[in-house]
Amino acid sequence: MKSIIFNEIKKILECDFTLENPKDKNLAHFATPLAFSLAKELKKSPMLIASDLASKFQNHDCFESVEAVNGYLNFRISKTFLNELANQALANPNDFSKGEKKQESFLLEYVSANPTGPLHIGHARGAVFGDTLTRLARHLGYKFDTEYYVNDAGNQIYLLGLSILLSVKENILHENVEYPEQYYKGEYIADLAKEAFEKFGKEFFSEENIPSLADWAKDKMLILIKQNLEQAKIKIDSYVSERSYYDALNATLESLKEHKGIYEQEGKIWLASSQKGDEKDRVIIREDGRGTYLAADIVYHKDKMSRGYGKCINIWGADHHGYIPRMKAAMEFLGFDSNNLEIILAQMVSLLKDGEPYKMSKRAGNFILMSDVIDEIGSDALRYIFLSKKCDTHLEFDISDLQKEDSSNPVYYINYAHARIHQVFAKAGKKIDDVMRADLQSLNQDGVNLLFEALNLKAILNDAFEARALQKIPDYLKNLAANFHKFYNENKVVGSINENDLLKLFSLVALSIKTAFSLMGIEAKNKMEH
């Protein structure tokens, strides 16, 4: 709707301007401060300029009123125009708030957790954010592909195999073992050890078989990770292996050398990342010739940046903040525009239950498992709460609040609005087709404002995507639900003179809730279950 109104205003003003959304919809649905920017050029007061501009909009079908207020030009949308938009939305509900197909393309890499154990709650935040960003981008018309980079090489995979070997020796063969400083623990390691022992037999468990054991366990963990993601309604398009890029390492090093991006010192090869804003240079090849994790990651990013996407987006844990300058430096040395590599950081999550820290999982050792939290509160509540705050800010929440059936639980509160609307239609004995002819002319000011809010979803979605600020969607839904509940409590619906107008208004509110919830990966309920 905002883009339609913007274009209508531009036809008359014939100049550049910005369109704002005033908080108080009783004053205006949209406003522009254009008069202030023209004041110096026209040598007039903003109030006079705004009054002159307002006079150009007399008898315009889109606007109920256009007024000059304190130098601002305030626009109120007409009921007739809102009704036209309502008819379009209700006639094609699956297309409501969708964007036209766009040329811009994106590749999102996210989750990419080491396949050394089940997903924990820290992984879950980036996973939910990435999946919702994907749903939103595709809804708005962008080509948006997703990828999981499987770290299936290096020391962490070896440690997985070693941890299973030591568990077999200690818990099954009852040998005395000495654990290294770093190893994987938890019930899942013991379970893997038991399964591996049954599969491979006693003779297999020696140090020379650690790589084979690690490979077997890595594949098992990747299957488990995919199951964890599916439980949270997350599907990633493709999984790419770190190992598959090893053969391309030498060619990448040659390219970096050619562009003076690397140098040799102390028997190591260094990335000259300090030349591009990093705090120091980074080792990419060790003295023994083995590549560091950064080396493989540079090869992978070179491949991603070469695939023709307009932008490559990564979602990383906040602890990877220092990794950004070195990766952008490598891409610049390789001839890419580092602005086309966008990094979104997912901050830490703290969980409480009844005000106390949530207990760590015995299955995972020192972590809270994503699957455990979903088992307690469901994937809908998990997804909502992870999207309720900006991704790069710390999030703390008490899962007990998400199990309540009252207004303190936002998922319940919004779902209750959606279910309430279905209940009202059932009570009236009507369906949406029965109210399509209603013209909405009887709506009072609060009703018009509620209708405007419901129809304004697309503008919210565009803002959320462009700013990567997905919390705008749950914020919108909370406000919409609150305004609906208030309006419902203050207005008689079934049996009223304007019953059809009100039911048509409510159907738009329900459509907005259902659409926005769907983009968040949440199912809108038609009936509340107790």
Curated annotation (Swiss-Prot):
Reaction catalysed by this enzyme: tRNA(Arg) + L-arginine + ATP = L-arginyl-tRNA(Arg) + AMP + diphosphate
InterPro entries in the cross-refs: aa-tRNA-synth_I_CS (IPR001412), Arg-tRNA-ligase (IPR001278), Arg-tRNA-synth_N (IPR005148), Arg-tRNA-synth_N_sf (IPR036695), ArgRS_core (IPR035684), DALR_anticod-bd (IPR008909), Rossmann-like_a/b/a_fold (IPR014729), tRNAsynth_Ia_anticodon-bd (IPR009080)
Molecular function in Gene Ontology: arginine-tRNA ligase activity; ATP binding
GO (cellular component) term, any one: cytoplasm
Residue positions of motif 'HIGH' region: 113-123
Subcellular location: Cytoplasm
SUPFAM superfamilies recorded: Anticodon-binding domain of a subclass of class I aminoacyl-tRNA synthetases (SSF47323), Arginyl-tRNA synthetase (ArgRS), N-terminal 'additional' domain (SSF55190), Nucleotidylyl transferase (SSF52374)
Keyword flag Aminoacyl-tRNA synthetase: yes
EC number: 6.1.1.19
Keywords attached to this entry: Aminoacyl-tRNA synthetase, ATP-binding, Cytoplasm, Ligase, Nucleotide-binding, Protein biosynthesis
Source species, domain of life: Bacteria
Enzyme class: ligase
Keyword DNA repair: no
Listed PROSITE patterns: AA_TRNA_LIGASE_I
GO BP terms, alphabetized: arginyl-tRNA aminoacylation
Family listed: Belongs to the class-I aminoacyl-tRNA synthetase family.
Assembly mode: Monomer.
Record-given protein name: Arginine--tRNA ligase
Organism for this UniProt entry: Campylobacter jejuni subsp. jejuni serotype O:6 (strain 81116 / NCTC 11828)
